[in-house]
Amino acid sequence: MDMATKIAKKVSEKGGRTFFVGGYVRDELLKIETKDIDIEVHGIDVDCLVDILESLGNVQKIGASFGVFNLKGYDIDIAMPRKEISNGRGHRDFEIYVDPFIGYEQAAIRRDFTINSMMKDVLTGEIIDPFCGIEDLKNKKLKHINDISFCEDPLRVFRAAQFASRFKFEIDKGTIKLCSSMDVSSLAFERVFEELKKALLKSTEPSIFFTSLKEMKQLSFWFKEVEDLIGIEQSKIHHPEGDVFTHSMMVLDEAAKLKDEAENKSSFMLAALCHDFGKISTTKLRKGKLTAYGHEVESVNLAHEFLNRLTNKISLKKEVLNLVKLHMKPNQMYNTSKKKSMMKLWDDAIHPNDLILLAKADSLGRGIDKDYSEIEMALRASLKDYEELMKEPEVSGKDLIELGLKPGVQFSEYIKLGHKLHLSGLSKEDILKHISNNIKKNQDI
C-alpha cells in the first residue's frame, strides 16, 4: 500500500478526506508521468493530521504554520486547505490561514489555473472539478480562476507562459489581459529563473514562453534583451525568416529538439536563447547590406548582464558564455580551417559536443530547409581527432623538472606552451626538445 493511501485511510477513519491536488491530477489526466505527489487533507484539524503522520513516519514540518508537511523518505507533500491573503508586493508577502473545513471550492479557488484546481479522492478516485479544469484540458486552454487571488502572486505571469509553452495551450484572453496588468518587478530572481528553466527544459517549443510574455507585454523587466531583439532586421539572403527575435525563437525550438544530446541541457538551452543578443547593438547597414560584425563578442557582454539578473550559478554562466562566444566558429571553420585551428576550437570549448549542437540549431533556425548532416559529420570527425589527440601523453611538471627547470612562474608558461604544441600535432618527444632549447636560450641571455 503506498503512503498516500495509508494517510488517506487513517484520515478517513477520523472523518476526513484526502485528495491528490494540483499538478499531480493535471499530469495524470494528460498521461504525463510525474514524481511529485501533492495531497490535501480536508475535514480534520492540524493536530489530528500531525498525529496521523507521526504514526506513519518521521514528520518534517516544511511549513507547519501554514499546514504543509512531509514524511522523511517519501516524495509527497501533505497540505491542509488554506487561505492566502496578500499583505505586500512580493511573492512571499502573504498572511496564511489554515482552514480544514473551508470546503472544496474555496480550497481550490486559491489555485492559479483551472487545470491545476482539480482534486482527486485518494481512496475513491472521484474527481472534484469546481472550475471546469477537465474541459479546459480537453480544449487546451489555460485560464485563471479568480482575478483577486491570481493577482496576489505575480509569479503567475511566468507560470502562465511556462504552462502554455510546456503543454502548447492557448492562454485565455482574460488571463493575458490580467497578466499584462501585473507588476513582476518585486519577484525573487530565483523564482523567475525556475519558471524559465522549466520552459527551456520541459517544453518542445520553448519559444511559446517568450511569445506569450511578449503578448502580455511582460518581457521588459526580466527579459529586456529578448525584447530588444524584436524588430532588429537581418539580411533576407541569410535570414529569410525575419528579425532577430524570430530567428532566436526558431533556434530555441531547434535546440529543444537536440537538448537530450547535450552534456549540459541548461547551459545549452540558455546559450541558444542568448547567442544573438549582440545583434541589438552591432546590426548596421553597410554598403547597402545589413551586417552584424562582431556580434558574438557583444552577445557575451549582454548575455552576462542577462544571466546576472537571473542566476548566481557561476559555473552555469561560464558554460553559457563560452558557448555564446564560440557559436559562430563551427559553421565558419568546418571546411576551411587547418586541423590545428579546429583542435584549438575544441580545446577552447567547455563542452565541444554542445557547441556542435548549438551551431546545428543556429543553422537550422533560419527558415531555410537545409540538411545539416554533412556539416555535422565533418565537425564530429574533427572532434573525434581532438579526443584521440587528448589521449596522447602531454608535458607534465615532472618532465620540466627532469629538464632542469625549478618550480616557479615559468612552470605554468611552459605547460601552456607544451599544450599549444600538442594541439598542433607535435609528439611529446619533439615538444620536450623544443622546450629544452627554449630553456637553454633563456639561460644564455
Language model region names:
Residues 1-445:
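Catalytic cores of the polymerase beta-like nucleotidyltransferase superfamily
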